[in-house]
Amino acid sequence: MTGRALAAHLATLALALAAPPRAAAAEPPAAGEPSLATPPRLKELVPAELPPGTSFPSPEVTVILSLEVGASGRVERASVESGTGEPFDGAALAAARRFEFEPGRLASGEAVPVTVTFRMRIREPAPAAPPPFRLAGRLLERGSREPLAGVAVVARSEGQVLARATTDAEGRFAVEVRTSSFTLAAAPEGHQRLEALVKGEPGETREENFYLESLGGPNETVVSATPLLREVMKQVLTAEQVAVMPGSSGDALQAVLNLPGAARAPFGSGLLILRGSAPGDSRVFLEGQEIPQLYHFGGIRSTFAPTFLESIEFVPGNFSVDYGRAQGGIIDVRVRDPSPLGFHGEADVNLYDVAVEMEGGLGGGWSLGGAFRRSWIDTFLRAVIPKDAHLSFTTAPRFYDFQFIATWRPDPSQRLRLMFYGSMDRVVALLEEPEADPTITGTFDALVSFYNLQADYLSALSSKLRQDTSLVLGLQEVDTGLGPQYFFDLKLRRLAARTSWTLELSPVLQGRAGIDAEVYGADVSLNLPNAAGPNPVPPSTLPQIGTTQYVVLYYPAAFAELRIAPFPSLSFLPGVRVDWYSDIRRWAVDPRLLMRWQVGPTTVLKAGIGLYQQPPEPQESAAVIGTPDLLPERSLQVSAGVLQTLAPGVTLEVTPFYKALDRQVIPNANANYDPSQPRYTNLGTGKIYGVETLLKVNLGDRFSGWLAYTFQRSFRTDPPSPQMPFDFDQPNNLTVLGTYQLGRGWSIGARYRLISGNPDTPVLSSIYDSATGVYVPVYGATNSERLGTFWALDIRVDKVWTFKDWKLTLYLDTQNVTNHKNQEDWLYNYDYSQRTELTGLPILPILGIKGDW
C-alpha cells in the first residue's frame, strides 16, 4: 500500500489479550440486575498512521489503550493507560477512535456501553525493496530454432523460488526478481534441462535467448555459470543511478562522460572527445539517427531530456558496422516508450532550468508522452558577470528543448514509434573593443537549433527474422554574426533512412545486413577570416573569405555482419561497411572484426580490430572555400580487454587500445599566398594509444559507484611540422564517484576528477601591424606547453518524500564545491607582453525540487 505514512501501513496491530476484549473491573452485579453476556468484538482493524521517517526506539512498540465502546459499537472515549510517547501514542489513539465493534450485549440481547483494554503493537517497517531485475527470454530448440511453448520456467536462489513463468507460443517468458543473482531452470519435455546462473543489476531489463538440444532419451541437466547464449554485453546505467549521480545534474548524457575514454572538454563547451579523437570525429545517435547537437550552451544540459531515455550505449572505439562516417567513437541513445498504463508526469524546477513531462496510455495499443524544458539562467547571469568585462548581454544565453513520443504496439511482434523532438539555443551580446583587436566590436549574435521528425518501426517477421527501420526528416539552423563584417548562416535539411535485417540461421550462425543513407540540402552564407594555421591571430590581419551557395550531399551506405559462435562461450563478429561520399566522390570500405570469449564464470575476454573512415568537413571539401578532391580521413583501431568479476557486485574492466590515423585533412598555409595551391590536403597523420580502466562497485542497495582511469596519449603530425601532442591530449584522466543511500529518503553522492591540462602553444613575442593597428603574436612550438592540472570535487544531496499518490524530491547538486580555480587558457594583454590565467566556472550549486506522479 502507499499513503501518507508507509511505515504505519506496514505496522501490525494485535489485541493484547488472548481472550476477547474484557470489560473494566467493576463490582459484581446485584441479584436481579442484568449481566454482560457478550463482550464487544472488533469488526474492523484500523492501522496506526505514523509520520514519514519516524524513528523507532525498538523493533516493536506497544501502546495499551482504554476504550469505551458505546451501544452503537463505536469508540466514544479513548485514553492511553501505558504508552511509549509520541508519535506512537497519538497514532494509536487516532486509529482506535476509528475502530468499529459488535457492541457488548446483556443476556437479554440489549446493547450496552462497555469499557475494554487493548494492547496495540506497532512494528518497524522493513526497508524498501530494490527495483526488480527483469529478464525477458525465449526458449528455443538448438539447431531448428523452433520455440518451446508451454514450458514452466522457475527463478530460484538458495533453494527458494523467486518467480515462475510459462513460455508462450513463441517460447517467450518474463520473470522479475529482486536479487542480483539467481538460477533460471526449465525442463522441457524431450529436451535438455536448463539450469543457468543469471546476474543483473536492480532496475535492469534484459532480453536473452536460451537454446536447448532435443534428446532421444531421458532429460539431462546442463549447468552453466552464464546463460547458454548472451546476445549483448554492455555497461548499464540505470535511471536510479543517473538521477542521483553527483556532478551530472541528473542528465544521463552528462553521466556517461564519467566513463573511461571520454576526455574533459574545456570551458564546458560540450565537445565530445573520445579516445583522443578530434571533437568532430565522434557521433551521437538517437535510436540510430544522428543528433546534430548534443549539448546546450555551457555543456551542462544535453539537448534530449533524460525523462524518456532508456539506456545509453557508450562506445569510445571499435564500434560495429552499423555505424560509420566517424573515426572516433559513438554514443547511441535508446528511448523508452511512454507508459501505456494510467497517467504519469514529472515537474522539475531548479536554479538552472524548469522541465515538465507527461505520459499515458490512449488505448488500442497507443501510448503518448511529451516533455518540455526551458532554461532561466539568463535571469541571473548578468549579476555574476564582472562590470569590467568587455561584454554585455542584450539576450543572455537561453535554451529550450522538447520531445513528443507516440508508440503503437498492435501485438508483441510489432512496434511503431513516432517522435518529434528539437532544441534551440540563443544569445545576443554587445562586445566592446578588446585590447587584442579593437576592430572586433559590435553585436555578437548566435542561434543554434534543430528539429527532427523520426519514425521507427520494429517487426518480427518470423521467429528467425527481424527487421528494424528508421526514417528521419530534420532541419538544422546555425545563425551567427559578429558586427557587420563577420557572419555564418546555415540552414541544413536532412533526410535519413536506416533499415536492417537480422536472421538467426542457427545457434552457431546469425546474419545481419542493412542500409544506411543520408541526404543533405544546405543553404550556406558566410564571410569569415581565412585562418590557415593552427594558432589564432587577430582576425583583422587575415584576409576574408566569403561565399553563398546551395549544396546537396548524399551519403549512402550498406553493411553486413555475421555472428559466429562455434561454442556458447566464444563468438566472432566479422563485418564490412561500404560508404559513398558524394562531396568528394569517393568510396570507403571498412572491414571490422570483434571477438568475445567467456573464459570462465567470472572472466570475459574481448578484442576488436577495424578500419574507420569519415568524409572531410563540408567546408573543407566545398568547391569555393575548400578542396573538392580530398580523400576520406581514416583510422585503424585495435583494442583488447578483460572483464573480471572480483567479488559479488565488484567488477574490473581493463582495455588497452591503439589507433593509427592517416589521410587527415589539414589546412595548407601556402594557399594564403598562392591561390593555385589547395586550401586543404590529406597529409596529416597521427597515433593514439592508452589503457582504459573501470572498477565498478555495487554493494547491495546502499552504495554504488566506480573508479574510471584512462591513461592516453594522442599525437598528430601536420607536415612540414614535426609530431606534436594533439590539442586535447590528456595523459591522465581519473574520475571517482559514488552514491550512498542513507535511508529515510536521504542519499548523498560525491565525484572527484583529476585530469591533465590540455596542451598549449606559448606566445614568445609580437609584431606590430601598422596597417591594422594591432599586435600579431609570434608563437613558439605548437603545443609545447601544458595548461594547469584540472581537479574538482562535486557533491550531491537528495531527499525524497513519498506520499500516497506522488513523490517529492529536494536536491542540491554542487559542482566544484571547493571553488578551485581551474585554468582553461591564457589571457594576453594587447601586445602579448603579459598574460594571466583564464579560469573556468567557479562553484556551481544547482538547487532544485522535483515532483513525480
Describe every region a protein language model picked out:
Residues 571, 658-660, 681-764:
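Gram-negative outer-membrane beta-barrel transporters
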Residues 426, 523-538, 584, 597, ...:
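Surface-exposed extracellular loop regions of Gram-negative outer-membrane beta-barrel proteins
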Residues 168, 190-192, 198-209, 220-320, ...:
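Periplasmic N-terminal accessory/gating domains of Gram-negative outer-membrane beta-barrel systems
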Residues 350-374, 391-427, 445-467, 505-510:
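Transmembrane beta-barrel wall of Gram-negative outer-membrane proteins
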Residues 494-500, 546-551, 631, 649-708, ...:
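Outer membrane beta-barrel strand-and-loop segments of large Gram-negative receptors
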Residues 421, 492, 502-512, 516-518, ...:
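Structural signature of Gram-negative outer-membrane beta-barrels, strongest in the C-terminal barrel
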Residues 25-162, 168-174, 181, 195-196, ...:
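Charge-biased low-complexity segments
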Residues 753-774, 788-792, 798-853:
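C-terminal beta-signal and adjacent terminal beta-strands/loops
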